[in-house]
């Protein structure tokens, strides 16, 4: 829904160059444009905790427009709260936690079987979704799907952005998405940049994070199971997006991009000249101690690793790093 921006007087008054987001009434009208065309077996929701409010609104709309569709919520929100999410969104049919590459196929299969069955008893539903588990909450049976990690992240195909080229109402939402900045003041997502971007796309170079900071939830992209894609694989994807979509910024929304110094240095050698020649810059997320690159401390004197990985990232075209520092509020720390 965020891809459908409205450019009207309200957007102009608020100086929203890419338009404002839809109101709840406008969102329902837009969703109806989909449900009037197709009777969906499966409707999947996804997002982080910041999307909970909108997911609840969208789910209420879907209950009116597509009451018999199998409705599952996945991604970071479902991974963080698991079954507890069902207390907030009881109209769901289940949740899918962790990574979705494999389990989405199982969910789609189950949805088709369930929709094609005239009457689905609790025992029948349990058999259909097996070996995934089920749980009963307030008298309703829900399915709890658990995703897994593909053995080789490099073997996965690149995201097929072209499927967003045209929706059922012949609306090109891909261009709206690419023309809306991922990060920066215009993005309205608590990020800030010293530069602007005209055409941007996001992707991930790694999943999870090997660290276990108590203040950080890393479940959106792999939890503590850290895995990376190779520099060569990243370069191929980067070139593909520049050549096909003409992007000038690529955002790696990793939980922690900078874990591997070796990968960063290899990436620098591979892409530094190419990014400069093709006018592409990129950004990502990392830890503050990785940016500092402290090797050790002897007699109160800090010794840094050489070369600094952030310098290597800069040489490779990185111009934005988002850090998730622990709260400076004593009350929050307590």
Regions found by a protein language model. Give the residues of each.
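Glycine-rich beta-alpha loop elements in corrinoid/cobalamin-binding modules
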Residues: 2-153, 157
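Radical SAM [4Fe-4S] cluster-binding motif and immediate context
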Residues: 154-334
């Amino acid at each position: 829904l965020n891809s459908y921006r409205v450019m009207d007087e309200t957007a102009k008054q608020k100086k929203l160059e890419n338009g404002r987001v839809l109101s709840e009434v406008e969102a329902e009208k837009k969703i109806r444009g989909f449900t009037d065309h197709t009777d969906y077996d499966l409707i999947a929701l996804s997002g982080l905790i910041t999307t909970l409010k909108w997911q609840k609104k969208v789910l209420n709309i879907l209950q009116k427009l597509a009451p018999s569709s199998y409705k599952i919520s996945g991604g970071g929100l479902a991974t963080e709260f698991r079954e507890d999410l069902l207390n907030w969104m009881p109209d769901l049919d289940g949740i899918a936690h962790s990574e979705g590459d494999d389990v989405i196929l199982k969910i789609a299969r189950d949805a088709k079987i369930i929709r094609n069955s005239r009457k689905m008893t609790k025992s029948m539903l349990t058999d259909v979704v097996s070996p995934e588990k089920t749980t009963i909450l307030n008298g309703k049976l829900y399915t709890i799907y658990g995703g897994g990690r593909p053995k080789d992240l490099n073997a996965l195909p690149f995201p097929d952005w072209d499927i967003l080229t045209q929706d059922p109402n012949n609306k090109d939402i891909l261009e709206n998405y690419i023309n809306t900045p991922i990060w920066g003041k215009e993005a309205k997502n608590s990020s800030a940049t010293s530069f602007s971007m005209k055409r941007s796309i996001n992707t991930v170079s790694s999943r999870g994070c090997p660290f276990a900071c108590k203040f950080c939830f890393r479940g959106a992209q792999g939890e503590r199971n850290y895995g990376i894609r190779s520099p060569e694989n990243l370069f191929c994807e980067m070139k593909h997006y520049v050549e096909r979509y003409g992007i000038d910024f690529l955002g790696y929304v990793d939980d922690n991009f900078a874990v591997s110094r070796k990968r960063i240095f290899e990436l620098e050698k591979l892409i530094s000249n190419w990014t400069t020649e093709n006018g592409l810059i990129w950004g990502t997320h990392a830890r503050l101690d990785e940016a500092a690159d402290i090797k050790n401390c002897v007699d109160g004197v800090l010794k840094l690793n050489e070369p600094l990985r952030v310098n290597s990232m800069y040489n490779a075209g990185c111009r934005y790093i988002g850090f998730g520092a622990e709260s400076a509020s004593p009350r929050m720390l307590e």
